[in-house]
């Protein structure tokens, strides 16, 4: 009888954990443009993300002006001329993790997944699929992703004067160091 009760408690705790919302306010997104003249990199360390583990729904949101560049002039051009951050202040990704029901939160492991969703940036929404690695260690959950986007897909125009300095294919790296349970 005691074994049945213990098993039931373990089962219910795993079900409860698998149905929670996990979030972070301190995720980071780094983008890199490698071009013949220079490499440009910027980081935004204030990425908000919420993951509903029961459904696999996941969302990322960030303010475009949150990207930090090594040079102030780069940041100014990025916000005013390319991403027009006053007009389009946010980038948002809403997606679903494929086969999320197979993720066991009780085991330490790394699970490679695909995330299908809609990336909205610069006023344009585009369906994309991105690879991600979800790491579970001692009950803590983190996630990494690395993928490429095209500036043309989001109508981001690069003047010909600087076209040798900016690659139209941008590498995007997402790092969510620790998801925490979202409490009401």
What are these language model-derived features?
Residues 1-21:
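Bacterial Sec-dependent N-terminal signal peptides
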Residues 19-184:
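Low-complexity, acidic/polar, glycine-enriched regions of mature
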């Amino acid at each position: 009888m005691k074994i049945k009760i213990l098993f039931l408690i373990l089962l219910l705790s795993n079900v409860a954990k698998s149905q929670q919302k996990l979030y972070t306010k301190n995720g980071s997104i780094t983008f890199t443009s490698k071009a013949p003249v220079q490499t440009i990199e910027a980081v935004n360390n204030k990425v908000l993300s919420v993951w509903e583990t029961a459904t696999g729904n996941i969302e990322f949101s960030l303010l475009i002006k949150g990207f930090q560049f090594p040079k102030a002039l780069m940041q100014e051009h990025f916000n005013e001329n390319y991403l027009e951050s006053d007009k389009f202040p946010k980038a948002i990704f809403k997606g679903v993790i494929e086969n999320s029901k197979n993720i066991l939160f009780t085991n330490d492991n790394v699970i490679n997944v695909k995330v299908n969703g809609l990336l909205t940036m610069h006023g344009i929404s585009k369906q994309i699929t991105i690879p991600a690695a979800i790491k579970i260690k001692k009950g803590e959950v983190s996630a990494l992703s690395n993928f490429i986007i095209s500036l043309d897909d989001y109508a981001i125009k690069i003047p010909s004067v600087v076209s040798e300095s900016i690659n139209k294919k941008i590498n995007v790296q997402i790092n969510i160091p620790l998801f925490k349970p979202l409490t009401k």
